[in-house]
A protein has these predicted regions:
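Beta-propeller and closely related beta-sheet repeat lectin domains
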Residues: 55-58, 126-129, 187-190, 246-258
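Beta-rich carbohydrate-recognition and catalytic domains
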Residues: 1-52, 60-123, 131-183, 195-198, ...
Length: 298
């Protein structure tokens, strides 16, 4: 039950003492001076939570050795209960947790929350994904939602940090590098830094205003302009799309992407859910192998 989890979920981490994976006992991620039941400012077990939104919420390592964990936290209202605007479902802020090495252990600090405007995104800021830009800024791209308010435009949202992930600019709709807005459903997405220096974003771009989570197709890969932190319009390439005869509920989402060391391409793990019908939760687990070309992927 997601609503029950929104009052309980917390994060744990584990470390390995060797180059080969040999995990040590896991531990709850808690800011110094806080407790298991109150692990961060404004987080209280039993009332709200801190969690990872999806597999695409990959931690980011900074040049100074710090680790940024792109999490999200449910929000408490003035009455102390879980907050959700009218017509919404769950409601979260993006919440980055910074880990720094001290004495052989990670010391955790919760960054300033990145809060959405419920009048523009009815589920707040969801499932952040991170990348480091050449000028030292950290780029965070986020999922929003117009759930329950389909008249609102469905966008991706973006925020930047200039201090290593502790303070963030107010979120704004993400655009192409030329400033034009694009539509995107409420779905996960991933920023992926390639060893050739390019920065890619993988997610769903919709041809018209989406309705909440739909449509979650086509799935695209796009190159990010690293000067502006915006998408390069000419660098958008389709990975997959709805095929003739497939249900409109098709979901090309909830994936995970990684660079393949052997080929330099990108492997994308995804199950094409609901291709036959909206209630059919059976689907093959697929791996897409993407060959990269300048300006995008083929």
């Amino acid at each position: 039950d997601p609503l029950r989890g929104m009052r309980q979920w917390q994060l744990h981490s584990t470390l390995s003492a060797r180059a080969r994976w040999s995990p040590l006992p896991d531990a709850q991620i808690i800011q110094d001076g806080y407790t298991a039941d109150h692990p961060f400012p404004d987080v209280y077990r039993g009332r709200n939570c801190v969690m990872l939104g999806d597999l695409t919420c990959v931690p980011l390592s900074l040049p100074d050795g710090s680790l940024l964990v792109p999490a999200q936290s449910s929000v408490l209202g003035e009455d102390g209960a879980l907050y959700a605007p009218p017509g919404g479902f769950t409601y979260t802020d993006a919440f980055i947790i910074r880990g720094q090495w001290r004495g052989g252990r990670l010391v955790w600090t919760g960054a300033a929350r990145v809060a959405g405007d419920p009048a523009r995104s009815t589920r707040g800021m969801i499932e952040p994904t991170l990348a480091l830009l050449p000028d030292g800024r950290v780029l965070m791209a986020m999922r929003g939602s117009n759930h329950g308010a389909p008249h609102l435009p469905g966008y991706r949202w973006v925020s930047f940090s200039e201090d290593g992930g502790l303070r963030w600019t107010p979120p704004e709709p993400w655009t192409y590098a030329d400033g034009e807005l694009f539509y995107s459903p409420s779905a996960c997405a991933q920023l992926l830094r390639h060893t050739d220096g390019a920065l890619y974003w993988i997610g769903n771009i919709a041809p018209r205003n989406p309705n909440s989570n739909s449509p979650r197709y086509p799935l695209v890969i796009a190159e990010v302009d690293q000067r502006t932190g915006r998408l390069i319009r000419d660098g958008v390439r389709a990975i997959d799309d709805r095929r003739p005869g497939e249900d409109a509920a098709l979901t090309l989402s909830n994936f995970y992407a990684r660079e393949e060391r052997e080929t330099g391409g990108i492997a994308l793990h995804l199950s094409r859910l609901f291709a036959r019908s909206a209630g059919d939760w059976t689907a093959d687990a697929l791996v897409y192998h993407l060959t990269l070309n300048p300006g995008g992927a083929a």
